[in-house]
Curated annotation (Swiss-Prot):
Keyword Lyase set for record: no
Subunit (UniProt): Homodimer. Part of a complex composed of the kinase OPG054, OPG092, OPG114, OPG115, OPG142 and OPG157. Interacts with OPG175.
Keyword DNA-binding: no
Name of this chain's protein: Virion assembly protein OPG100
Organism, scientific name: Variola virus (isolate Human/India/Ind3/1967) (VARV)
Chief subcellular location: virion
Induction: Expressed in the late phase of the viral replicative cycle.
Compartments where located: Virion; Host cytoplasm
Keywords assigned: Host cytoplasm, Late protein, Virion
Record Pfam families: Pox_J1 (PF03338)
Function: Late protein which is a part of a large complex required for early virion morphogenesis. This complex participates in the formation of virosomes and the incorporation of virosomal contents into nascent immature virions. Plays a role in DNA packaging during immature virions (IV) formation.
GO cellular component, one term: host cell cytoplasm
Similarity field: Belongs to the orthopoxvirus OPG100 family.
Highest classification ranks of the organism: Viruses, Varidnaviria, Bamfordvirae, Nucleocytoviricota, Pokkesviricetes
InterPro entries per record: Poxvirus_J1
Length: 159
């Protein structure tokens, strides 16, 4: 099994195997593994954004990727919320599980698709979604642009 397949399968699994694996690695290996995962997540994000743009081209607003969408996770009870945000240190003496079922098939398909996709062959910058309400630098740029626009409108009105 390829190392990236191993990593992605653990990462996408709904357990703490990925954290146990990272805890058992040295810092350099852990950071390298995280970089590998972010490259695949960037590819998935690019696919999602392009798909959203196709939907918007036919007039459908896909709320899950829009700026106004505020809910990322639906919680049926407080236990789900607690599980998601539990920051208890991981015990490293546990066994790492590896799902070799449909999740593993998904990982292999994702890796093949990324390798064969025209999107992956073009040089793209990492895809990041910028939320203007949370990104300070972007918010500052927007404030400058708005203040310049207000000054221009004021000068047009006074002349």
């Amino acid at each position: 099994m390829d190392h990236n397949q191993y990593l992605l399968t653990m990462f996408f699994a709904d357990d703490d195997s990925f954290f146990k694996y990272l805890a058992s690695q040295d810092d350099e290996s852990s950071l390298s593994d995280i970089l590998q995962i972010t490259q695949y997540l960037d590819f998935l994000l690019l696919l999602l954004i392009q798909s959203k743009n196709k939907l918007e081209a036919v007039g459908h607003c896909y709320e899950s990727l829009s700026e106004e969408y505020r809910q990322l996770t639906k919680f049926t009870d407080s236990q789900d919320f607690k599980k998601l945000f539990n920051k208890v240190p991981i015990v490293t003496d546990g066994r790492v599980k590896l799902n070799k079922g449909y999740l593993f098939d998904f990982v292999i398909s994702l890796m093949r698709f990324k390798k064969e996709s025209a999107l992956a062959t073009t040089a793209i910058d990492p895809v990041r979604y910028i939320d203007p309400r949370r990104d300070i630098a972007f918010s500052n740029v927007m404030d400058i642009l708005k203040s310049n626009k207000a000054k221009n409108n004021y000068s047009l009105l006074s002349s």
